[in-house]
Amino acid sequence: MPLELISIELTNRCAKACWFCYNHSLPEGDTRWTVDQVVGFVRDCAANGVKAVSFGGGEPLQYPGLFEILERLDGTLFRSLTTNGLLLHGDTLDRLVAAKPNKVHVSIHFPDRANEVTRVIGQVNDLAARGVKSGVNFLVTRSNLPAAREAAQRVRDAGIGNDRIVYLPMRGRDTPTPNELAEVAGKTPFQSMTCLTKCGPSPRFASVGWDKSAAWCSYTVSRRPLPSLTHAGLVAAMTGLGLEFCGGTEDADGPRAARPLPLVA
């Protein structure tokens, strides 16, 4: 199994507590990872061909050992993280910059909230000015496309181009079509998830949860516990694991959503 990228949810603790969070993160969330476990697991994966690790959550800046993990893995492989940005200021920002991550993306979950868009633009540009490669994870819902188009244009006008923005369609319900996502991106080439047009696993990617479970995708409920915190344990957990589609069905309770697809072995 030629895994090249792993995503690790360090915690399911997050002060933002978005209702749509695939990780069901809450302010009182928890973790089952120690710093030594994360470092040892990632180092073993790197020794077996993994080239990059992405840290998420929950909110990775609410995981107390994040900076130590980044520092201890410096030079081992490409290290990135995605944050909601609520803590990205003052001493926390200074410590993150000092830990020298290879890339940081700040999320815009609510493009209709002008204050959030303004904050994220400032944080992304501040990170870049301090030598940290940075970008935006931009969530798009089908029911709010006009606000998404306007906010995305604001981000691009601020000097953050599509090469630094990942446009993410809402999953489960209120899911935009690929064409609608392209309109938000300004009808120019853009980055999104590999499953944008078709649900299916990538043999290059694995998602590892805060509870030490593994999956082909961060959004799916098809998960399996790691038998050991090693690359071999990750491969064992992924082998034969299905992939349940993360979309919903059309119903009267919400906006149009994608239709479910069958399990993929």
Model-derived features: where do they sit?
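N-terminal pre-core extensions flanking Radical SAM catalytic domains
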Residues: 1-29, 43-46, 213-218, 227-265
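Radical SAM enzyme [4Fe-4S]-AdoMet core and its adjacent flexible, acidic
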Residues: 99-103, 107-237, 262-264
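Intrinsically disordered, low-complexity regions
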Residues: 30, 59, 86, 160-162, ...
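Acidic-enriched, low-complexity/disordered segments with a strong bias for Aspartate over Glutamate
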Residues: 4, 30, 36, 44, ...
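Intrinsically disordered, low-complexity regions enriched in small/polar residues
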Residues: 22-24, 43, 65, 80, ...
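Proteins with a high burden of low-complexity, intrinsically disordered sequence enriched in S/T/G/P/A and R
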Residues: 1, 56, 60, 122, ...
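Conserved alpha-helical substructure of the radical SAM core
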Residues: 1-94
